[in-house]
């Protein structure tokens, strides 16, 4: 569990890529949609690891799965930044390039996180799948 600055605890799952992969220094930070939890996205994460040889870090927002709290727009952005900071500070991943990937609700989270961290030279990409730009329509503040 990863603690947030506002004292929630977030569940996460890290899938390491193959040991000597040329993409071993790349981690995809994956944000899921509103329906389900990270467990439902494991097949996608595994496919990314197998096809690209990268690592995948999947975060479960507050109020989803095993994470504590209740979801709202502010909280989801705290969760996203917490995950990003965790990857940037963790010994195993601090030197990795990061691609942020968001599905549906996770796309709105991903866009805001990428905008907030756009000056980080290790943030090298943003992937959006079936997304929208406003979380308020789905998760009220």
Cite the ranges covered by each PLM segment.
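Conserved Rossmann-like nucleotide-binding pocket used by diverse enzymes
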Residues: 57, 101, 127
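Active-site micro-motifs of SAM-dependent methyltransferase domains
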Residues: 36, 63, 107, 133-134
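Membrane-embedded segments
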Residues: 2-86
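Short coil/turn segments at beta-strand junctions that form active-site/ligand-binding loops
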Residues: 23-26, 95-97, 122
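Hydrophobic pocket-lining residues that define ligand/cofactor binding sites across diverse proteins
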Residues: 87, 91
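Alpha/beta-hydrolase fold nucleophile elbow
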Residues: 93-104
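A generic structural motif
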Residues: 53-54, 93-94, 121
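Hydrolase active-site cap/lid region
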Residues: 109-141
């Amino acid at each position: 569990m990863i603690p947030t600055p506002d004292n929630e605890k977030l569940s996460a799952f890290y899938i390491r890529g193959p040991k000597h992969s040329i993409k071993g220094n790349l981690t995809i930070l994956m944000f899921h949609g509103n329906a389900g939890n990270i467990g439902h996205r494991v097949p996608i994460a595994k496919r990314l690891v197998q096809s690209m040889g990268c690592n995948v870090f999947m975060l479960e927002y507050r109020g989803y799965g095993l994470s504590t709290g209740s979801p709202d727009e502010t909280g989801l952005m705290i969760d996203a930044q917490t995950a990003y900071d965790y990857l940037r500070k963790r010994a195993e991943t601090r030197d990795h390039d990061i691609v942020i990937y968001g599905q549906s609700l996770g796309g709105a989270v991903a866009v805001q996180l990428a905008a907030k961290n756009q000056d980080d030279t290790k943030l090298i990409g943003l992937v959006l799948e079936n997304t929208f730009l406003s979380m308020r329509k789905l998760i009220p503040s």
